[in-house]
């Protein structure tokens, strides 16, 4: 994921599912060094991860 998209997700009114190594995360902050501060939804653990390791989960094609 790039920094611009991560920032769009933070600012969005919608809930957009983002995964880090298969685990759902909430992006807390995009940092200048191509890192993001995230919190893991199921464990509440927080850490800094590289933006390239974040994946936006796509909605099913038949989702309306």
Swiss-Prot record:
Keywords: Sporulation. It holds the Pfam family SspH. GO terms for biological process: asexual sporulation; sporulation resulting in formation of a cellular spore. It comes from the Bacteria. It is found in: Spore core. One of its GO terms (cellular component) is endospore-forming forespore. NCBIfam families: SASP_H (TIGR02861). HAMAP family: SspH (MF_00667). Belongs to the SspH family. This is Small, acid-soluble spore protein H. It comes from Acetivibrio thermocellus (strain ATCC 27405 / DSM 1237 / JCM 9322 / NBRC 103400 / NCIMB 10682 / NRRL B-4536 / VPI 7372) (Clostridium thermocellum).
